[in-house]
Amino acid sequence: MDADAPAGYRDPSGRHGAVTLPARPEPVAFDADATVLIVVDMQNAYATKGGYLDLAGFDVSATGPVIERIARAVAAARAAGIRVVWFQNGWDPDYVEAGGPGSPNWHKSNALKTMRLRPQMNQRLLAKGTWDYALVDALTPEPGDIVLPKPRYSGFYNTPLDSMLRARGIRTLVFTGIATNVCVESTLRDGYHREYFGIVLADATHQAGPPALQEGALRNIETFFGWVSDVAAFEAALSSDEARRIPA
């Protein structure tokens, strides 16, 4: 392990992380068997023209390369034995899970606001079973992956994520997906407060809104909540001799 990697990466059995990933603000080390790759909300809603974000006025024109880099990160993770967790954000077709007027989600969700302005969109945006809710065609879960629905921005809220991670001895969460400044950051922050180490692969994420929001979210994460790296560094770190070494 790189001498500059955080000391917190010594697990209770005394092992150091076998993988050292170049990152900001410093290199970060982890063990593949104690790590998951989280793919946040790579649904048509967030990454495809004609999906919710596009219809709500957000620019999704740059998501193609992000999808390609997520596919690379997923392939690298699988090859290294890192489990992949997929999130899909949304609600039942009647939007009971969205919370109703008594929930701030009803007032702040741009999907719900778009449907109130355009009633013809009702039961089409982020509704389970719809094209909008589905993952993009280029990203497909495989047997052994974990696929979880989530009703709010954070993947920890009202989901079994925490218990599933703890049961598997997971300590490190590597994030990709959309939107960096909303669901990615919300989930990473909640993980930080549950003692998980969070890493974002910046070029495998995309913001909702202007580019300044991407920069701000990444700066916030690297300063206060985690580490920021990229897909090429992730691939290289996982393919190193030490990372491939089977623990005794």
UniProtKB/Swiss-Prot annotation:
HAMAP family: RutB. Belongs to the isochorismatase family. RutB subfamily. Pfam families: Isochorismatase. GO terms for biological process: nitrogen utilization; uracil catabolic process. It is an enzyme of class 3 (hydrolase). InterPro entries: Isochorismatase-like_dom (IPR000868), Isochorismatase-like_hydrls (IPR050272), Isochorismatase-like_sf (IPR036380), RutB (IPR019916). Hydrolyzes ureidoacrylate to form aminoacrylate and carbamate. The carbamate hydrolyzes spontaneously, thereby releasing one of the nitrogen atoms of the pyrimidine ring as ammonia and one of its carbon atoms as CO2. Its EC number is 3.5.1.110. It catalyses: (Z)-3-ureidoacrylate + H2O + H(+) = (Z)-3-aminoacrylate + NH4(+) + CO2; (Z)-3-ureidoacrylate + H2O = (Z)-3-aminoacrylate + carbamate + H(+); (Z)-2-methylureidoacrylate + H2O + H(+) = (Z)-2-methylaminoacrylate + NH4(+) + CO2. Disulfide bonds: none annotated. It comes from Methylorubrum extorquens (strain ATCC 14718 / DSM 1338 / JCM 2805 / NCIMB 9133 / AM1) (Methylobacterium extorquens). The gene is rutB. The active site is at D41, K150, C183. This is Ureidoacrylate amidohydrolase RutB. Keywords: Hydrolase. One of its GO terms (molecular function) is hydrolase activity, acting on carbon-nitrogen (but not peptide) bonds, in linear amides.
